C-alpha cells in the first residue's frame, strides 16, 4: 500500500467487504482529511445504504488530537464527527484503553476510527492481566474522579491535561469531577 490516505482507506474497505478484518493506519489525524471522502461516502453510510445488507468492519487507526507538531497543528474533530456518521469514533486516553477498544472492535461488525493519544505512547501504564481479552464498552463515559464543585468532561489526549489542571485546582480547595467520554 502506498502512502496515499485515500488508497489506504479504499483498500481497507475492499478487504473488509470481502470478509477480512483490516486495520488501516493513517499516520496522523490531520492526514485523515485526505481519506475523508471515501470513508464518508463508501464506509460510514454502507449499512444505511444497504439496509444492513452489507458490512465492512474496517478499523482505521490514527494518532493525534493534541500535541501535534508544526505541520499537524489542527484538530479537525468536528469535521470528522460530521463526516463519519455511521462509524464509531473512539478516543482512548491511553494505550491500555486503546487495546480495550481494539479488542472490542475485532468482535463487532461496525467500522470505526480510533484516535490514539499521541502524548501517551511512551508512558508506563498499569496493564490488566487479561490485556488480550478485555474490552472497553462504546458509548459509556467513565468517571475517573469524583468531585463536588466542578464537573470536567473531556476525552483522549486532553484527559492528562485535565488531570494536571485538577491537581492545581485541588490546591485551591476546588473539588473536580473528571469524566472521560471515550467515544464520540
Where are the model-predicted features located?
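Redox- and metal-dependent alpha/beta enzyme cores, enriched for Fe-S-associated oxidoreductases
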Residues: 154-175, 179-182
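Short beta->alpha junction loops
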Residues: 2-4, 179-184
Amino acid at each position: 500500500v502506498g502512502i496515499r490516505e485515500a488508497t489506504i482507506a479504499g483498500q481497507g474497505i475492499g478487504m473488509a467487504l470481502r470478509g477480512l478484518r483490516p486495520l488501516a493506519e493513517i499516520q496522523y489525524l490531520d492526514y485523515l482529511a485526505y481519506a475523508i471522502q471515501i470513508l464518508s461516502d463508501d464506509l460510514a453510510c454502507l449499512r444505511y445504504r444497504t439496509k444492513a445488507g452489507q458490512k465492512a468492519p474496517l478499523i482505521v487507526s490514527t494518532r493525534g488530537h493534541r500535541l501535534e507538531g508544526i505541520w499537524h497543528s489542527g484538530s479537525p474533530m468536528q469535521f470528522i464527527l460530521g463526516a463519519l456518521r455511521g462509524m464509531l469514533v473512539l478516543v482512548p486516553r491511553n494505550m491500555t484503553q486503546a487495546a480495550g477498544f481494539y479488542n472490542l472492535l475485532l468482535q463487532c461488525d461496525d467500522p470505526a476510527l480510533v484516535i490514539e493519544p499521541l502524548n501517551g505512547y511512551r508512558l508506563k501504564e498499569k496493564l490488566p492481566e487479561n490485556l488480550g481479552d478485555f474490552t472497553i464498552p462504546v458509548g459509556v463515559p467513565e468517571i475517573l474522579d469524583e468531585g463536588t464543585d466542578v464537573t470536567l468532561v473531556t476525552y483522549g489526549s486532553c484527559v492528562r491535561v485535565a488531570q494536571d489542571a485538577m491537581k492545581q485546582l485541588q490546591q485551591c480547595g476546588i473539588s473536580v469531577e473528571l469524566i472521560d467520554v471515550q467515544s464520540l
